[in-house]
Amino acid sequence: MNYSKDEIKQYVAEEDIKFIRLAFCDLSGRQKNISILPDELDRALTYGIAFDASAIPGFGDEVHSDLFLMPDTATLSLLPWRPDRGRVARMFCGIARPDGTPFEADARQLLKKAVADAARLGVTFAFGTEMEFYLFRRDESGEPTKIPYDHAGYMDIAPEDKGENVRREICLTLEQMGVRPECSHHEQGPGQNEIDFRYSEPLTAADNAVTFRTVVDSVAVRNGLAADFSPKPLSGQPGNGMHINISAKSADGADVMPRVIAGILAHIRELTVFLNTVDASYLRFGGSKAPRYISWSSENRSQLIRIPAAQGEYRRAELRSPDPLCNPYLAFALLIYAGLDGIRSGTELPPAADINFFSATEQVKAQFQTLPATLAQAKAAAESSPFLARLLPQAVLDYYTK
């Protein structure tokens, strides 16, 4: 819920909050923040807090360097891992120009616009993520190593699964912040873990994904470990994915999911650079249940889009290519627009590819388009896309393609 200025100030006083983090993300999805004292709350909630945009790649230059953080009071949350005395709270922020207009390269604002555009068509989206990460040991100097915390396998239990207590601490911390995980387990790789989230409306789901990464990093440090979200931390081992579960419903009761899936399949090559943002992302494709071919099917985990065996409100499409280094605000916004394009254009869903791509012959696989094989190919696909040129500010497109 949105809190009034007086309610925020009262809460801060009652909870002995001494610092308020005003959080936002850069274009890559990395969280940034400015911390203010309670005395500055009134100014922050009325006028915003200025920051130097020229220091954030893609946000501006020295000539046009002033932007303002505008707190979203609905996102107020305590940070449970901070001290009980002199506590710390956080609010996510929108970004505005000095005249009060929204900053066009604010990915959170781009997602809000996508949600509003979908609502005008009578379509509501929801997203749930499946987040994978590795836990590595630290050396005697406290620096991260590539030594896995354990050597357990998929869904193993203690004592082989040493990450169980860490995952529990992560989930309980998230619950204290109002973020509700659905389940957690050990993944296939040594020291690899997964925590899944139920559906939320798009903005909340993206906020939760950013919060999750912060909590995992903080809990790992508290346990003398290092969390690694990179798409391919260890050669010869499974990579980290961020599977995105997508649900779309139409106000008129029509089943729009086939068109949404068709739209995403039609645009996935040009979207890939926003879902898989680093060179190592492309080392993950095609191995350990990570897709390479542009296809869909029911239940089949070798596909790009899988339709899980779920009914009713749990019916969804699972996009399996993204990884945890993506900007969730931008990723969700572009998936909404791809789905809406499928609905508007009446794009037909191609036949399901009921084959196992991990064991299929080259002759069979040659019938399907592939995701970009390298970051350079993904950048080229995005740069030449009329679809993206219509949707994204040039600064955002340049950041990802230059």
Language-model features: where?
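Glycine-rich, acidic/polar active-site loops that bind/position phosphate-bearing ligands
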Residues: 1-402
